[in-house]
From Swiss-Prot:
One Gene Ontology molecular-function label: small GTPase binding
Annotated source species: Mus musculus
GO annotations of cellular component type: cytosol; exocyst; midbody
UniProt modified residues of type Phosphoserine: S412
Annotated positions of the N-acetylalanine modification: A2
Taxonomy of the source species: Eukaryota, Metazoa, Chordata, Craniata, Vertebrata
Keywords per UniProt: Acetylation, Coiled coil, Cytoplasm, Exocytosis, Phosphoprotein, Protein transport, Transport
Name of the protein in question: Exocyst complex component 5
Entry-annotated residues carrying Phosphothreonine: T122, T395, T405
Function (record text): Component of the exocyst complex involved in the docking of exocytic vesicles with fusion sites on the plasma membrane.
Coiled coil: 40-101
Amino acid sequence: MATTAELFEEPFVADEYIERLVWRTPGGGSRGGPEAFDPKRLLEEFVNHIQELQIMDERIQRKVEKLEQQCQKEAKEFAKKVQELQKSNQVAFQHFQELDEHISYVATKVCHLGDQLEGVNTPRQRAVEAQKLMKYFNEFLDGELKSDVFTNSEKIKEAADVIQKLHLIAQELPFDRFSEVKSKIASKYHDLECQLIQEFTSAQRRGEVSRMREVAAVLLHFKGYSHCIDVYIKQCQEGAYLRNDIFEDAAILCQRVNKQVGDIFSNPEAVLAKLIQSVFEIKLQSFVKDQLEECRKSDAEQYLKSLYDLYTRTTGLSSKLMEFNLGTDKQTFLSKLIKSIFISYLENYIEVEIGYLKSRSAMILQRYYDSKNHQKRSIGTGGIQDLKERIRQRTNLPLGPSIDTHGETFLSQEVVVNLLQETKQAFERCHRLSDPSDLPRNAFRIFTILVEFLCIEHIDYALETGLAGIPSSDSRNANLYFLDVVQQANTIFHLFDKQFNDHLMPLISSSPKLSECLQKKKEIIEQMEMKLDTGIDRTLNCMIGQMKHILAAEQKKTDFKPEDENNVLIQYTNACVKVCVYVRKQVEKIKNSMDGKNVDTVLMELGVRFHRLIYEHLQQYSYSCMGGMLAICDVAEYRKCAKDFKIPMVLHLFDTLHALCNLLVVAPDNLKQVCSGEQLANLDKNILHSFVQLRADYRSARLARHFS
């Protein structure tokens, strides 16, 4: 195994190195078994290898010493070189300081010399300038302009500078001595001003922005500079309104000018603001007037729609213009422009809105009643009418015929949707067009119109008509349409409440009008709920009355006391069948007409009255043994019917009634035991006794003794 330095590079493991050495030595490993193992040969190999390692170690050591000597030599040379560089750097730094001091000295001298030259040159330049102006002034005084600056059209810029200065000087001269020359200078001033504006106009038409900038810079010191801006604004608008959308045209125009105006004028914000002012006060104001004045008196609906649309689009344009630099208070500037256009229309907006909403709502309602061939009648309230209504509710006395509505509820979702849609649009216009301080008050006025026409003129009228159409409780085969009124009224209440929350609340949420609106809404709903409750109560009375008619007409005394006890089929009676059919139909109608807890409340009330009716009805008859079985079958059927109510209390009442009916058939000896049973134990003894008294064998079997 050759020994090299590479074998000892990291990672080096001595055990592995020995293992490899042994494995390569013949007779040193485990190959060939124990017989092949030669320890002498292995020892010899180890001795030789150790000698090789010693030789290699000496060789490496000599190499390390040589490298260390070389490193020390190079370190000394490098240190010497660094010292030389430090000395050289110190010399250079000294030279730099000397040069810096010399430069500062020279600069001071130059500045001093410059100040001296300027002190001499400035008066000289002023003198030269004054001399030139005197020369030009003499030409005006003589009446003949000979200087090249006035005769050469290419030097209009220099001429403008001269005439502008002469114009200022002429203003200081006395009029009586220099009136003629002042007049000539003023005339030349005006001519040059016109030439410059004409040059600016021509450059604008050619699209030469650089020339426009030069001329504008010259005109900046002339009185006609504002006229130059006016010309620029006028020419910018030529051909700018080619589309059908004036607002989009105006936005594009302002965007184009905004990109260009900074390259032409030194005061771009003022120029752009003046352009926008021109667009609003001339173009937009004229357009708005044409659109609105045409329909202001003849068509309120179109007027309001146009006003809302134009105002919205104008404010939308204003929002786009807010992106431009128009000076410090651009918000106020744009608001004033919008106000100047619309102020005459916004001052009386809410009066137009209220007037239109009233007439439109009245028309929607009248159109509906006309489609039904219905002449809206005045529903009496107060005094005699209220007294009649109370007596009608609490007795069965006929106090005049009820109104026959022929099944018509006089409620229309289409009418409601139309009224709500008109009001929604009115709220949107109110939000956009009202002054923030007037917004809650205006929104409240719109809400009162909605209450008047939707809640009072439509819903309340339908409820009153529905109440008047409910027959008395003793009417036979009465058609009960009030539940249809209830169903539609509930749907309309939900729509009304949704609009209140979605469209009115955001407009009044932070104002005192909120509590006023909530109170008005509460009063309206309470008033209508009271009428609904009254109508439902009277409808339930009619239902019970109809059941009474069925029972009176169909139930015979022989049903429960048959002549032939042996020839009786044990099933429910015909009266029971018809009552159950009627009740199931009414229960289904109630479930379809109401929602939530209202269904349970009404069904519980109907169930309690139904139970009372059957209880009192059963008390009218005498029962034989077989008749008692029939009564139990009837009550069992009534109980099945009561299950459809899904009201635990009603079911419990019929369970108890069913248990009471068992008293009609139980053997006399077991009567006391049954009375103390789980379902009857809590009942009053008189109730139990009253049922037992209905038995045909009450006297013969001496059943009274069980209750003595």
